[in-house]
UniProtKB/Swiss-Prot annotation:
SUPFAM superfamilies: Glutathione synthetase ATP-binding domain-like. Its EC number is 6.3.2.-. Belongs to the RimK family. This is Probable alpha-L-glutamate ligase 2. Binds 2 magnesium or manganese ions per subunit. Gene3D superfamilies: 3.40.50.20, ATP-grasp fold, A domain, ATP-grasp fold, B domain. It comes from Shewanella sp. (strain ANA-3). Mg(2+) 1 binds at D248, E260. Mn(2+) 2 binds at E260, N262. The keyword ATP-binding applies. Pfam families: RimK, Rimk_N.
Length: 299
């Protein structure tokens, strides 16, 4: 098969592992920077171009689109879909998962466990917003933040009011969530592929830090999932419409709660912690599904 990988970073671990796994299985692979693509959209024959050259046909596309280029990256991916190319994760699923508030709303409708979450626009609503999530301590998140950036733990009510007011003053979109103290600075990353969790790791925050992201200095280790945790992770990925997802869970006193669904989960941490060939499993999944008939995505 001819496989395109949409990625700005050909030297990134995840991209290199996918290229390696696909090549090992006899496929032709091309890493394409979506920001270098431009599109011809017409009723006869749509196409994608780079540097004056039209891209050749591909059987499948694996999107590794960073959060900062979601809009343009999704547009390029959608063009591949409109041309009949199988997308491992489609543009609609990626857009859903990148909108933190929308993803929370969708999962709440499906009855998936979540931290109590509040969203408001007016500063006069701040006191009620804080009460809604159980008071301080609480977590304040920028809707556009990634890798733990733009996440604040407000330990007192006064601190919470000040931080929320400051973000609102900057016209930044934020959501407020209850703080799951019993998680003790740890979360669980479930790597979902299709209808299975194929790998999982526990991420522990550094001492004095509540964010467990590996980019923030957290450490990763093997973890045994409960049947409920597996079910929640798979349901969360399906709710977003994703074939591949990194679902982040916290173990709370009222069961597993989903913090985030990542449509472009990194492979380095999960492969290192579990010693599993996650990249190989992804390529095998693409092989099994790319040749099936696939209608163009809905806009």
């Amino acid at each position: 098969m001819r496989i395109a990988i949409l990625s700005q970073g050909p030297e990134l671990y995840s991209t290199k592992r996918l290229v390696e796994a696909a090549t090992l299985r006899g496929h032709e692979v091309k890493v394409i920077n979506p920001l270098e693509c431009y599109m011809n959209i017409n009723m006869r024959q749509s196409s994608i171009h780079i540097g004056g050259e039209e891209l050749p046909p591909f059987d499948a596309v694996i999107p590794r689109i960073g959060a900062s280029i979601t809009f343009y990256g999704s547009a390029v991916l959608r063009q591949f879909e409109m041309m009949g190319v199988y997308a491992l994760n489609d543009s609609v699923g990626i857009s859903r998962s990148r909108d933190k508030l929308r993803s929370m709303q969708l999962m709440s409708r499906r009855g998936i466990g979540l931290p109590i979450t509040g969203f408001a626009n007016k500063p006069s609503d701040i006191p009620d917003l804080i009460d809604m999530v159980g008071g301080a301590p609480l977590v304040i998140k920028l809707l556009e933040g990634t890798q733990g950036i733009g996440v604040v733990l407000a330990e007192t009510r006064k601190a919470a009011e000040s931080v929320i007011e400051a973000f609102m003053g900057l016209k930044a979109n934020i959501m407020v969530q209850e703080y799951i103290k019993e998680a003790n600075g740890a979360d669980i990353r479930c790597f979902v592929l299709g209808d299975k969790v194929i790998a999982a790791m526990k991420r522990q925050a550094m001492p004095g830090e509540f964010r467990s992201n590996l980019h923030r200095g957290g450490t990763a280790s093997l973890v045994k999932l409960t049947p409920e945790e597996r079910s929640v992770a798979i349901r969360a990925a399906k709710t977003m419409g994703l074939n591949v997802a990194g679902v982040d869970l916290l173990r709370s006193n009222h069961g597993p709660v989903v913090m985030e669904v990542n449509s472009s989960p990194g492979l380095e941490g999960i492969e290192g912690a579990t010693a599993k060939d996650v990249a190989g499993a992804i390529i095998e999944f693409v092989e099994k599904n790319a040749l099936k008939a696939k209608k163009p995505t809905q806009a």
